Amino acid sequence: MKPPIALACLCLLVPLAGGNLVQFGVMIERMTGKPALQYNDYGCYCGVGGSHWPVDETDWCCHAHDCCYGRLEKLGCDPKLEKYLFSITRDNIFCAGRTACQRHTCECDKRAALCFRHNLNTYNRKYAHYPNKLCTGPTPPC
């Protein structure tokens, strides 16, 4: 009996390194073709923290990612430090992990990476390294 394709893909897992930021970065780069650092400090939500109204759809992806991490923190997870397992095909990301926190963190990162890919046309260099003082408007709820 042949193993399911998802199991075969898990044999090609990305190595684990220092929290999940490296893992998230790999997802972003593979899904968008852009260096992950281009999403750090983008708009009002990509990077550490976030407030006010997102500047575009790419920034909304980061807002949703922040909300996802916030929900996990309320459940007792530490998503910024969770190391998880994942594999990537051309069009999708498959998550795995020993714990629910690992799997859910991977799912948060997966949704954000796929959101970035879906909204590549909204990425605007003028929002890269965007000063937080330029962020305006109310902070949308999760």
UniProtKB/Swiss-Prot annotation:
Matches recorded under PROSITE patterns: PA2_HIS
Cofactor(s) essential for the protein: Ca(2+)
Organism this protein belongs to: Mus musculus (Mouse)
Predominant place of localization: secreted
Endpoints of the signal sequence: 1-19
Enzyme class (EC, first level): hydrolase
One example GO MF annotation: calcium ion binding
Knockout consequences: Mutant mice show abnormal hair follicle ultrastructure characterized by defects in the companion layer, the inner root sheath (IRS) and hair shaft. Mutant IRS cells have large cytoplasmic cysts and pyknotic nuclei and are devoid of keratohyalin granules, whereas the cuticle is abnormally dissociated from the hair cortex and medulla, indicative of impaired hair follicle development. Mutant mice are protected from obesity and hyperlipidemia in response to high-fat diet.
Pfam families: Phospholip_A2_1
Swiss-Prot/TrEMBL catalytic activity: a 1,2-diacyl-sn-glycero-3-phosphoethanolamine + H2O = a 1-acyl-sn-glycero-3-phosphoethanolamine + a fatty acid + H(+); 1-hexadecanoyl-2-(9Z-octadecenoyl)-sn-glycero-3-phosphoethanolamine + H2O = 1-hexadecanoyl-sn-glycero-3-phosphoethanolamine + (9Z)-octadecenoate + H(+); 1-hexadecanoyl-2-(9Z,12Z-octadecadienoyl)-sn-glycero-3-phosphoethanolamine + H2O = 1-hexadecanoyl-sn-glycero-3-phosphoethanolamine + (9Z,12Z)-octadecadienoate + H(+); 1-hexadecanoyl-2-(5Z,8Z,11Z,14Z-eicosatetraenoyl)-sn-glycero-3-phosphoethanolamine + H2O = 1-hexadecanoyl-sn-glycero-3-phosphoethanolamine + (5Z,8Z,11Z,14Z)-eicosatetraenoate + H(+)
The keyword Magnesium appears for this protein: no
PANTHER family: GROUP IIE SECRETORY PHOSPHOLIPASE A2, PHOSPHOLIPASE A2 FAMILY MEMBER
Taxon lineage: Eukaryota, Metazoa, Chordata, Craniata, Vertebrata
GO cellular component terms listed in the entry, alphabetical order: cytoplasm; extracellular region
EC number: 3.1.1.4
Name under which the protein is recorded: Group IIE secretory phospholipase A2
Highest taxon, organism lineage: Eukaryota
A Gene Ontology BP annotation from the UniProt entry: arachidonate secretion
